[in-house]
Amino acid sequence: MPKKFEEILKEVENDLIEMAELCAEQTENAVKAFIESDRELAKQVRKRDTTIDLMEMKIEEKCIKAIALYQPVSGDLRELMTAIKISSKLEKVGDNASKICKILLKSDVEGNRKNELLIVMKDYLINMLKNAMIAFKTRDESLARDVYNMDKRLDDLYEQLYRSMISKIIENPKNLTLYTEIIFAGKYLERSGNIVASIGDRIVYMITGERIKEEEIEEELKKEKDIEKNIDQIND
């Protein structure tokens, strides 16, 4: 392939890493805003989500142009197609961070939202995201598979959070709205974990030409999409 094509691949790689870093920062700030009831920070996170949307469009445009101009095959083609998929998935991670802030901004509850499990989930998700991008950059199949498998732990953490909040609702039903908001925030983090796991699967495909468990992932994401739609309707 021409040198220009290799330069485009490198540009796309750098763009994806930058996008992932912004998604991690948005997730960090979203949870911080939520637990501290910092509405100004929440507004900033919501505003910056547009930047992530634009980055996705930029990456997709570069990849499509490269495919049209150079007609790559095999590994090069898989890399460009994977980049398009990853950028789309990162955009959804950014959306979920924004939606956590939306919960706060639409709420009239001023209670204490601080929850250690929520913080642990956030830290774990950001670690998953960082590992996914290391796997992408270094073409580390083993690490990409680890990212895929890490999602189970995040699911377990969400279950703990959910059960804890249900217990609190039973004990103190007057705080139903507050505890429900914490559940929704945790669900958006858990949803992002599923998305990052699917990024791990895509990286394995880029490296080997094979998916990990394609049908399982697609079915899980479909279920999560239905749940997310219901949550969004409640929060609208």
Swiss-Prot record:
**What family does this chain come from, according to its entry?**
Belongs to the PhoU family.
Q: What is this protein called?
A: Phosphate-specific transport system accessory protein PhoU homolog
A GO CC term attached to the entry? cytoplasm
Q: Which domain of life is it from?
A: Archaea
Quaternary structure? Homodimer.
Cellular compartment(s):
Cytoplasm
Q: Has keyword Transport? A: yes
Query: Is Oxidoreductase set as a keyword in this record?
Result: no
Q: What broad taxonomic lineage does this protein's source fall under?
A: Archaea, Methanobacteriati, Methanobacteriota, Methanomada group, Methanococci
Any Pfam family the entry gives: PhoU
Q: What does this protein do?
A: Plays a role in the regulation of phosphate uptake.
Q: Name one GO biological process term.
A: phosphate ion transport
Q: What is its main location?
A: cytoplasm
Key words, A-Z: Cytoplasm, Phosphate transport, Transport
What InterPro entries has UniProt attached to this entry? P_transport_PhoU, PhoU-like_sf, PhoU_dom
Report a single Gene Ontology molecular function.
Answer: protein homodimerization activity
